Amino acid sequence: MKGLFVTIEGPEGSGKSTLITKLLPYFENKGQKVIATREPGGIAISEEIRTILHKKEYTTMEARTEALLYAAARRQHLVEKVMPALEADQLVLCDRFIDSSLAYQGYARGLGIDKVYEMNRFATEDCMPSLTIYLDIAPEVGLARIEKDAAREVNRLDMESIAFHRLVREGYLQIVERFKDRIVVVNADQPMENVVEEVIQLIESKLL
């Protein structure tokens, strides 16, 4: 498969979405064929699943149900949007991918990173990113950012306890150690322009 698949990961409030809105015009202005997308979502079916996953009222959702819904949304998104873009030799910038499931459901929910990884290997047919940027930030800082962002609608995961969000970060740090070949850690607790500059350099090194 051609193209370059780049995923942006991080806990709540790490600045993933903001980063992608900065990266997209930069690469477009460079003449690079590029698309930006997100998980869960990116296409109609997966956006419907996103609505279910984020609905604040669904506090009784069981961990396996949650993991399976994310995997289902991921599969459809991959087949319908990501794979065709890669085949067309495009740069794909994706807000979240498999590592989110490993950190949130595998580690923080206690399903086991290996179990959730195998579930997602089935869903993705081992289609993995060439580069993953992990935006690391303390959960207290990330959640404080969310509280200050009046434009952001609070979702079901935002409402989890601080203990849960600490587990998410712990999970991510374990995943970083496991997949050092493709995951690069970027400090998200710094001005966004610094983050953007650092990430652009990382992506451009892969495009050479």
Curated annotation (Swiss-Prot):
Stretches that traverse the bilayer: none
GO cellular component: cytosol
Gene Ontology MF terms: ATP binding; dTMP kinase activity
EC numbers, comma separated: 2.7.4.9
Keyword ATP-binding: yes
Catalyzed chemical reaction(s): dTMP + ATP = dTDP + ADP
Coiled-coil regions, chain positions: none
Stored CDD domains: TMPK (cd01672)
The keyword Acyltransferase belongs to this UniProt entry's keyword annotation: no
UniProt keywords, alphabetically: ATP-binding, Kinase, Nucleotide biosynthesis, Nucleotide-binding, Transferase
Gene Ontology BP terms: dTDP biosynthetic process; dTTP biosynthetic process; dUDP biosynthetic process
InterPro entries documented for this protein: P-loop_NTPase, Thymidylate_kin-like_dom, Thymidylate_kin_CS, Thymidylate_kinase
A UniProt-annotated Pfam family: Thymidylate_kin
Enzyme class at the top of the EC tree: transferase
Binding site for ATP: G10, P11, E12, G13, S14, G15, K16, S17
PANTHER family referenced in this protein's UniProt entry, alphabetically: THYMIDYLATE KINASE (PTHR10344), UMP-CMP KINASE 2, MITOCHONDRIAL (PTHR10344:SF4)
Family of this protein: Belongs to the thymidylate kinase family.
Cited function: Phosphorylation of dTMP to form dTDP in both de novo and salvage pathways of dTTP synthesis.
Name of protein: Thymidylate kinase
